[in-house]
């Protein structure tokens, strides 16, 4: 079973939906949508659009975490992260 990861950033949601669909139709059985910080809402939108377009797509796992990121002047801050695993039967 192959698994591909799609990292969500600042591009439009449709670009990420297309990337996920391409990997699913090119032989991958699983897609992991990953995002941090403000991109989390864009990741959730991507997954919902995928679930609407592919009725047989299954939500396998959702993992939430907090990552420590180094900022300017040596400060550290916590950033939320999400990983959503989708699979097709």
Residue ranges, per PLM feature:
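An N-terminal amphipathic alpha-helical segment
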Residues: 3-29
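C-terminal edge-of-domain segments
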Residues: 60-89
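Short glycine-rich, basic-tinged beta-strand/loop micro-motifs
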Residues: 25-41
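Arginine/glycine-rich "motif VI" loop of SF2 helicases in the C-terminal RecA-like domain
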Residues: 26, 53-57, 75
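Residues that cap or initiate secondary-structure elements
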Residues: 12-14, 39, 68
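Conserved helicase motor "Helicase C" RecA-like lobe of SF1/SF2 P-loop NTPases
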Residues: 38-55
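Structured beta-strand/turn binding interfaces of compact recognition modules in eukaryotic regulators
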Residues: 11, 36, 87
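Beta-strand cores of modular interaction/reader domains in eukaryotic scaffold and signaling proteins
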Residues: 7, 32-34, 83-85
């Amino acid at each position: 079973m192959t698994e591909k990861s799609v990292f969500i950033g600042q591009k439009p949601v449709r670009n990420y939906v297309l990337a996920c669909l391409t990997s699913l139709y090119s032989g991958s059985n699983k897609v992991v949508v990953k995002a941090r910080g403000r991109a989390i809402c864009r990741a959730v939108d991507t997954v919902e659009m995928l679930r609407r377009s592919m009725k047989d797509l299954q939500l396998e796992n959702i993992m939430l975490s907090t990552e420590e990121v180094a900022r300017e002047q040596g400060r550290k801050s916590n950033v939320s992260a999400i990983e959503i695993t989708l699979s097709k039967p």
